[in-house]
């Protein structure tokens, strides 16, 4: 048995060891016999094939070893010229493969001359050399094919690895881009929600401020109205008091002292004078009241319209100025009425205090 020559591996982690078996040729008169020593191989682990194109016999086989290793062989033998190809047969016994190749013509070696034997030996040697050459060429081709196959397989594996790497990088990049887009969309959504909330809060504050301003305006107008009504009421009360005092002065009789006693006699002249005086003041006050009443009515109508405009936020600067002018005019009229009443009351009290003394001096008894 020949020694193991070289080891070859594949991408799957399995290593092959090439095995070169020993072979022996035997030339017999009836046939040519080839014995191949295949110790360690079973019959099912080998294969014998005849190649018609090259007239050669190919013997191949492989068997497993330990540690994911395999032993294999691939041998080629040339079939002799004087051979019946259809009757080639083989047998496997005691680890030896025997291939029998029957001859077309049976030769008797014992009766051949010496020259024939020499020629037969030379032919056999040439056949062995040709067989060796063909075997080496076949092995070289197989080696080249195996190397090409391994190179192709390696390139395919590298290509697949590169494709996997590119796919993984593209997938990772796509995931990063998708995560980035999601974060940007989330940030935009949060910013939009925050902006909307701020706008809503600002709008609510603006509405509250406008409502508060409207309430203040209404309260101011209400206070002005109440103040004007209070002043009007006060003037009316003062007027009623003044009128009642005038009536008492007009109806009070004048006492005249005589010798027989005192007699109350009215004085039409003075009464008419007082009446005329009271009448003049009354006319002034009455005119002021009428003007004030008209002004108040007008102010009420304007106030209602202005209040409606304030509620609708339609009041203008001219209407505000007009409201201020109306208030000032009312105050002026109230002051004028108060002044006239005060002047009249002062003159009435001074005349009443001087009249009794004059009457008493004129009616003093003799």
Swiss-Prot record:
B- repeat ranges, renumbered to this chain: 163-176, 178-191, 193-205
Tell me which residues make up the sHSP domain: 14-121
Identify the stretch(es) annotated as Disordered.
Answer: 345-366
Main subcellular location: membrane
For the region 6 X 5 AA repeats A of L-E-E-[SKR]-[ERK], give the residue spans. Answer: 129-220
Record localization? Cell membrane
Q: Which Gene3D superfamilies match?
A: 2.60.40.790
What biological function has been recorded for the protein in this entry?
Seems to not be involved in heat resistance. Unable to mediate restriction of long-distance movement of the pathogenic tobacco etch virus (TEV) without causing a hypersensitive response or inducing systemic acquired resistance.
Annotated protein name in UniProt: Inactive protein RESTRICTED TEV MOVEMENT 2
Naturally occurring in which organism (per UniProt): Arabidopsis thaliana (Mouse-ear cress)
Gene name, please? RTM2
């Amino acid at each position: 048995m020949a020694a193991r020559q070289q080891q070859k591996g594949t991408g799957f982690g399995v290593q092959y060891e090439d095995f070169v078996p020993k072979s022996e040729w035997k030339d017999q008169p009836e046939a040519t016999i080839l014995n191949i020593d295949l110790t360690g191989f079973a019959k099912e682990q080998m294969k014998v094939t005849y190649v018609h194109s090259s007239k050669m016999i190919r013997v191949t086989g492989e068997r497993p070893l330990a540690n994911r290793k395999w032993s294999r062989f691939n041998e080629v033998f040339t079939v002799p010229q004087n051979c019946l190809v259809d009757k080639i047969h083989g047998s496997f016994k005691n680890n030896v493969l025997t291939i029998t190749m029957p001859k077309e013509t049976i030769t008797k070696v014992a009766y051949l001359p010496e020259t024939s034997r020499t020629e037969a030996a030379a032919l056999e040697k040439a056949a062995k050399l040709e067989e060796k050459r063909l075997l080496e060429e076949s092995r070289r081709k197989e080696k080249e094919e195996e190397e090409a196959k391994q190179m192709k397989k390696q390139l395919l594996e590298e290509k697949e690895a590169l494709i996997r790497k590119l796919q993984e990088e593209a997938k990772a990049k796509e995931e990063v881009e998708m995560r980035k887009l999601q974060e940007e969309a989330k940030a935009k959504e949060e910013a939009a929600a925050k902006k909307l909330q701020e706008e809503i809060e600002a709008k609510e504050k603006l509405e509250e401020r406008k409502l508060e301003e409207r309430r203040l305006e209404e309260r101011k107008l209400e206070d002005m109205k109440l103040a004007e009504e209070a002043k009007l009421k006060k003037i009316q009360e003062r007027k009623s008091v003044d009128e009642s005092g005038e009536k008492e002065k007009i109806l009070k009789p004048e006492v005249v002292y005589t010798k027989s006693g005192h007699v109350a006699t009215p004085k039409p002249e003075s009464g008419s004078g007082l009446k005329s005086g009271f009448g003049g003041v009354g006319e002034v006050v009455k005119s002021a009241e009428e003007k004030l009443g008209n002004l108040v009515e007008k102010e009420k109508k304007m106030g209602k319209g202005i209040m409606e405009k304030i509620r609708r936020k339609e009041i203008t600067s001219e209407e505000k100025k007009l409201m201020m002018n109306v208030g000032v005019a009312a105050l002026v009229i109230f002051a004028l009425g108060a002044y006239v009443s005060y002047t009249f009351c002062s003159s009435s009290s001074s005349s009443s205090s001087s009249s009794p003394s004059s009457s008493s001096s004129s009616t003093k008894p003799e």
